[in-house]
Each structure stands twice: as structure tokens, then as C-alpha cells.
Amino acid sequence: MRPPVKPPSKEKFIAKKFITLSEFLDEYVQLYGLNHWGASYLSNNRHRIEHYIKPYIGSVLLRDLTTHDLDIFYNQLLEEPAVILKGHKRTDRTVSPSVIEKVHGLLRSALNQAVAWEYIARNPAQYASIPEYTPGERAIWSEEDAASAIQLCDDPILRSAMLLAIGGSLRIGEVLGLTWDCVDLSDPAQPQIKIDKELERLKKEDLEDLKRRDRSKVKFEFPNWKKTPSTTVLVLKAPKTESSKRRIYLAPTVGKALADVKAAQEQAKALCGDGYTDYGLVIAHDTGRPYEERQIAEKLKAFIQEAGLPPVVFHSLRHFSTTLKLQISNGDIKAVQGDTGHAQARMVTDRYAHITDESRQHLAQQMEKDFFHRSTAPASPVSTSQDADMQALLPLLQKNPDIVKLLIATMK
């Protein structure tokens, strides 16, 4: 016989009744976050909790938190100084609306869980108002600018990284995490790469927490080359989603650049001898060590300034690549999705299909040529058009009499 369910203890009920938002968020991360979030998302959410939520409303009792409290909190954040991450330049900027939007999303998710756990009856974040803002569009190069960048860049590392981002529609972590065992240059006319990992720097605390839950996607941890202990670790990890694992066909120009990089690495190995550590990385220092995202970003920024090109960030190259492929393929979203690794085709069109001024101008010109030119031109005699059609159709009917039967059948 099933034993009776024990009612919750009085102590537990009292604890639930007087739990603060800060205490609840700690529990939320442990019971929910560590079972659902990846390392980067876990790190970002912990940062938002510690720096943007707890200092302001962490002491509020969970049961007392209202929608009005959250509206006041979000407006207060607009006037607070933004938190400066370690290694970043100090600025006088206040918390941006985009950060507040992310904080709100985190609180809404957490408070939904509070409802599920019966801490509260309703979610006060459901009807809270966040400051409105229009996200700025990410600047991308035109085809002419991108072509100039490839031609002008004489840094083999940066050029190869740009070619992979543009030719393969890769994210920066996928570019830096690409290894030679995933590169196939056996057919120079059709080089291929396989994306099954990415390079990323993670907080050791977050990584260890996920390891204890057997949820770490890390394939390899690089050693710490600093002379002092570090709270972070550079890793090669599996992509966030299964759809990000993919095979990509590259243009021969990209394959040729990769072959040149491989040859240069072999020379570096010979020169460095034991000083070269071979991690198998395509984008690597002369000692074999990996490049990090900020190092490539610095290279790109310096090159853009020197070349006089419009300023863009490295991720803009992926945007440019996706847009260009959509245009070249006449909107073959599935083919482009295969390169970008998006889980859903809609994400390609919603996030990356930026219609440039050139394509919009071309569209207007095509409308003039294909539609308006005919609609405003003098009308031709119908009989002339019909005669021309019959002249074109006659040889086809002579070669294939079955078409005559089909035409007769459609007239009935």
C-alpha cells in the first residue's frame, strides 16, 4: 500500500513565505539553470543576477515583489552606471535598454518558475514595462567593400579568418576552433570543412558546475599560459545546437588560402622545433597556440583603419555572407541554412537577410524592365503575338505529336 503523502513542514512553509528574491534566484540557478543552460548563458545570467538584480531588489521578499516594483527598478537602472567587465575600457555609460531587456527576460523566466514551485500565485514580470528602444542595425560591408578587404589584406591570419567567415558563413568561435582534421582539400575545385566544435573562453566556476551535472560540452581545455592563476579557461567545445554541426562546401579561393596557411604552419613547425605545440588549429600563432576572439577583433579594427574601409565587427562578415548567399541563390533559404547552421529557416530570413541599397535599386530597375516598360509601350497587334507563338510552337509539335493530344485535351 502506498504510504500517505506527508504535508510540508511548518518550517518549510515559513521559509517559503519569507524567502527573498536574492535567495530565490540562487535556488533558481541551481535547480533550473544548471540543468538547462550552456556555459556561456549560465555565465551571462549569473553576471546579470549579481550586478544588476541583487544590488537593487535582491532584498525584497519574493512574495512582496510587484509589477510596480519592477517598473520602478527598470527605470532606475537606466540611470545607473553600466558594469565594466574585466579587461574592458572604463566608460561613463549607463545601463542600456538592451541590457534591461535581458534582465527582464531573466526575471520573467525565473518568476515563472517561482509560480511553478508555488512560491507565488502570479508572475509580476508578466505585465512589467521595459524602456522601449530600437536595436541598431549591425553595419555590414557592401560587395565592393568586402572584395576590397580580401584583396588588400596582407595578414595571412586575418585574411584566412575573413575568408572562412565570408565563404563558410562561420561564427568567430567556429573559425578559431576549426582544426585540420575537419578540413578536406583533396579536391581543389571543391574544398570542404566540417564544423563540430568552437573555441570559447569560459569561467572555471561555470564549467565545473556543469561538469558535476554531466552537462559539459567541452572537448579540450587549453593550458593556462599566464604566470598567474586564472578564473577562466580557453576550451574547444561542441556547438550549442545539433544544427550547428554541419559540413560546408567552400569556394576554391578559400581552399587555396587554407592550403597556403597549412604550408606556412609546416614551415613554422620546422623553425620552432620543440617550441611549437601542435593543437591542430587552422588559425594559430607561430607557436601553435590559438588566437582568441579579441585578438582577431583587434587585427580587423587596425586593418579597417589602415585600408580606409567602413567600420564593421567580425560577426558582420557572417551577416554579409548570409545575405550574399541568399541573393546569389535567388532566396534558396534551405541551402543557405545548411551553411549557417541555424536550427530554423525562419531565423535566416529574420536575422540575416538584410536587403542592401544595391539590391533594392536593382529590384526597382528590374520592375521597370520587366513590367513597367511593357505596360507603357505601344500595344502590339494581337495577331502578331499569336503568330510568333505559333511559329515557336510548330517545331516542338512536329517533334513530339503527343503534345498535340495534350493541347486538345486541355481545350475540352
Mark where each language-model region is.
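Catalytic-site neighborhood detector that most strongly recognizes the C-terminal catalytic loop/helix
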Residues: 132-134, 140, 197-201, 340-366, ...
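Conserved tyrosine-mediated DNA breakage-rejoining catalytic core shared by Y-recombinases
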Residues: 129-130, 145, 178-266
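Basic, Lys/Arg- and aromatic-enriched nucleic-acid-binding interface segment
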Residues: 83-87, 91-97, 101-103, 116, ...
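N-terminal DNA-binding module of tyrosine recombinases/phage integrases
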Residues: 1-72, 261-278, 357, 372-385
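Basic/aromatic DNA-contact patch characteristic of tyrosine site-specific recombinases
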Residues: 1-19, 23-30, 34, 40-43, ...
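C-terminal catalytic core of tyrosine-transesterase DNA break-rejoin enzymes
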Residues: 116, 163, 167, 174, ...
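N-terminal core-binding DNA-recognition domain of tyrosine site-specific recombinases/integrases
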Residues: 17-117, 135, 289-295, 310-316
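Short, polar N-cap/turn motifs at the start of nucleic acid-interacting alpha helices
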Residues: 182-192, 311, 330-353
